[in-house]
Amino acid sequence: MDVAAQFGDNLIRCRKLANLSQDELSVMASVHRTEISQLERGLRIARIDTLAKLYGSLEVDPGDLLVGIVWTPGDMRIGRFKERAPDG
């Protein structure tokens, strides 16, 4: 599972444990509901300020939104950031 999809699953889990709808979380976190939907579906990666708003509103540890995410440099692509080809 890629980083965006894993984060999305974690966000859904935390939101449901808090008994919040996307709309309710949107208001509490000051993050547009469409962005929350895209994050949950793994269509985008959360910026650090968005991450802080989400874990603060959900009253969870930041690590709860990052469970299962392992980053190995060069092993995946995220959004518009792409691996660079080796020189030579």
List each model region and its residues.
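A detector for short, charged/polar N-terminal pre-domain segments
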Residues: 1-6
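Recognition helix of helix-turn-helix/homeodomain-like DNA-binding domains
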Residues: 30-45
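Ser/Thr-centric signal marking residues that sit
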Residues: 21, 34, 50
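DNA major-groove recognition helix of helix-turn-helix/homeodomain DNA-binding modules
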Residues: 30, 49-64
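Short basic helix-loop element that most often maps to the first helix and adjoining turn
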Residues: 9-28, 53, 79-81, 86-87
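Conserved hydrophobic/aromatic packing and binding residues within compact polymer-binding modules
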Residues: 11, 25-26, 36-39, 65
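Short, charged recognition helix plus adjacent turn
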Residues: 56, 66-88
